[in-house]
Amino acid sequence: MQKILVGGITGSGKTTMAKGISARLNLPFVEIDGLFHGPGWTKRPEFFEDIKRVTDEPAWVMDSYGYSIVREILLSKADTLIWLDYPRWQIMPRVIKRSIRRAVTKEVLWNGNFETFKNFAQPDHPIRWAWSQFGPRRKLMSNLLSDPAYKHLEVIHLKNIRAAREWFRELARVGRS
């Protein structure tokens, strides 16, 4: 477990899990949204090259595989995929609370971007995205995992928050021994 992707729908806790794994295993953490988003929510022109550079490193933990332009690179270079496959009823309260908190506090995200209440109506807003993409993203992951090109991946399929916490506790215990 040296090149780790954490996958799941928006709001599943990918970044939190990836940061925790990074700290526990002492591996570099890479936040994919920080590489993707430029000022004004634009795509950074360097995104593809940055991903290639990062994935050529001997070890990393990345918090998503979601951008289709780099999905193949990420899945082919990773050795482990942690799939946070929680039920919708566990996802939605998390993403709603996070979006409200970010809009109220004007939390600065990547390259000066921040969520606003005005953006809640946009189809790609995290709340709407998590709802509309729940089924399609699950199907995408199942299809990807049945692709022979990705048989090399060790897949850790965590089906609810409790299972994820238990798995992480075990990782922490093993990491200390």
Predicted segments, located by residue:
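Hydrophobic anchor at the beta1->P-loop junction of P-loop NTPases
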Residues: 6
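NTP-dependent small-molecule kinase module
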Residues: 24, 128-177
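A glycine- and Lys/Arg-enriched "phosphate-lid" helix/loop adjacent to the NTP-binding pocket
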Residues: 86-137
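Walker A (P-loop) ATP-phosphate-binding motif of ABC ATPase nucleotide-binding domains
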Residues: 3
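Walker A/P-loop
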Residues: 15
